[in-house]
Amino acid sequence: MSDRVQRLAQLQDLELMIREVEDPASKMKEEALGFSVEGLAQLQNARSRLLKQIPKQDLRAYQRIRRKYDRAVVPVMNRICLGCFQALPTSVTRNVSEAGPLPICENCGRILYWL
Amino acid sequence: MTAERLLSYFGESRFVPELRSRSKDGVLGEMARVLADEGEIGDPALLLEMIRRRESLGSTGLGKGVAVPHGRSTAATDTRIVFALSKKGVDFGALDNEPCRLFFLIVAPYEDRKHEYLPLLGKIVEVVSDEAVRERLLQVDSFGAFTQTIREAFGE
Ligand SMILES: [Zn+2]
């Protein structure tokens, strides 16, 4: 797993959790089951800290894709992109160098996260 | 939701008859590793981070010895439940400060097309709200005994 993709996946999970905590309907459903859901501020702090660890160009790519899709980072299973369910060409690999391009699905443009 | 439907999220390889860990963080790690070991999760570290973060919003120890850690992760492709027991009990920071003995880890993918995540969470909470069911679950020593107990809880 590339650290660069891993951090973007972390950011995505964190932003999803923030969205759920911010959504009164989803928060109420969990609370009705007996769970406590507090601490939006600490999630936002964690997000700020994480943002500082992500290279600027990776963050820009992530945010650009997030404007188009709900998920910017999607898992790859059996060489299928689980964002658009198309097979990936063999030229796409899980190996990501520190400075090279992020692994992107040619078909939908999402960032690929190898399981 | 039928018993069969609920049981479809569990599995023999996701049944832990006795947890080794004695701490909350250890239990979360041990249960996340179960999913990683069966190839359900690519990266247990990513999953674990999400579960720990969810716990920071409030313990999922619901009281009466039951904990239901849960969350959605980019590392998950399908909704899965790990069921684990700790006969000695683990301090999970539960609302009633009682040690937890019954653990259900629910992990769902980021995109929940079938909208199964919250109803599933609700069903688990409902099943374990019955004291007799909790007592029987504490005694199960095999996955078969577990599924039998769940079916009985549904009156089947
Ligand atoms: Zn794609």
Regions found by a protein language model. Name each.
Chain B
Residues 1-156:
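Cytosolic covalent-transfer regions centered on His/Cys nucleophiles
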